């Protein structure tokens, strides 16, 4: 009976199983170990414990080590539980005070900006009164300037009229007539004419100076006003 022939594998050609390295071994070990998060145990307080803790917190927010131990013994709690509760309660109280302060500050700011009565502020009326008063002052000043300018213009015009009056021209005409004498005229006649012309010129100049004074102007204006009133 023939036996099956078994193939003999040569050591040089037969594949060898690869052995894992140390890095691969450590990686597999890490994968096998799944990290487990420790869940914090939350303390559940009874209503009686909460009443005692809140009452003590209202009276005293910071407790000493001895006071916390006494309170934990009374409430059948651990020292750490009492300490954690007081810390959390203090943080809540500070947050609540901060929120209320922000709300109150916003309310005060809006109250200042909004005017519920609907009346205009006092400074607007003062501004209107000041502007009205300034307009009246400007009108008074403009009227006074107008009156002063009118008087000055009248004085100047009167001076010009007095200076350019026919009396002054008459003096010039007399001088011109004297200068137009013929050279054959006697010397005595020429001297007499010059003296007469000089006296007339002095009289005219004095008259013009008199009428150019402010007192004469006032009298003239009053006289003209009275004459106009009588005509009416």
Swiss-Prot record:
Its predominant location is: nucleus
Among InterPro entries, the record links this protein to: Distal-less_Homeobox_TF, HD, Homeobox_CS, Homeodomain-like_sf
Which Gene3D superfamilies does UniProt cross-reference here?
Homeodomain-like
Compartments (UniProt record): Nucleus
Region of interest (Sufficient for strong transactivation activity), residue spans? 168-232
Is Transcription regulation found in the keyword set? yes
Q: Where is the signal peptide?
A: none
Taken from the UniProt record, the cysteine pairs bridged by disulfide bonds within this chain are: none
State the residue spans of region: Disordered.
Answer: 1-39
List compositional bias (Basic and acidic residues) regions by residue number.
Answer: 26-35
UniProt KW keywords: DNA-binding, Homeobox, Nucleus, Repeat, Transcription, Transcription regulation
- Compositionally biased region (Polar residues): 11-25
User: What are the ranges of the sequence repeats?
Assistant: 123-127, 128-132, 133-137, 143-147, 148-152, 153-157, 158-162, 163-167
Q: For this protein, what is any one GO molecular function term?
A: RNA polymerase II cis-regulatory region sequence-specific DNA binding
Region annotation (8 X repeats starting with a Trp in each unit) ranges? 123-167
Q: Which family does it belong to?
A: Belongs to the Nanog homeobox family.
Q: What is this protein called?
A: Putative homeobox protein NANOG2
Organism of origin: Pan paniscus
